Swiss-Prot record:
Cleavable signal peptide: none
Higher taxonomy: Bacteria, Bacillati, Chloroflexota, Dehalococcoidia, Dehalococcoidales
Natural source organism: Dehalococcoides mccartyi (strain ATCC BAA-2266 / KCTC 15142 / 195) (Dehalococcoides ethenogenes (strain 195))
Full protein name: Aspartyl/glutamyl-tRNA(Asn/Gln) amidotransferase subunit C
Any one Gene Ontology cellular component term annotated for this protein: glutamyl-tRNA(Gln) amidotransferase complex
Gene3D superfamilies the UniProt entry points to: Glu-tRNAGln amidotransferase C subunit, N-terminal domain
Gene name for this UniProt entry: gatC
Domain of life of the source: Bacteria
Pfam families, A to Z: GatC
Amino acid sequence: MKLNREDVLHIARLAKLGLEEDEINRLSKELSALLEHFEVLQQVDTTGVEPTAQSTPVKSVLKEDIIKPSYDREEILSNAPRREGDYVRIRAVME
């Protein structure tokens, strides 16, 4: 699949990226090559292969949660630059 200039610009807008002209041309080629690799993978016959997210057996690497004493809520909130009730108030990070 070949991505054209408009495709790259659309993807960049979705990702909120500003691209220079040379970046648009380079990304068009690189993303097209990447999609071609996926097209090859789509042709692989996976009949009879169980879907999996992990190809090798792995035991859980997560540690068990251990409850420990924490700081006093009021002490934490008193150090916050802004607070609203029992919450720390911050600037919006998303539009």
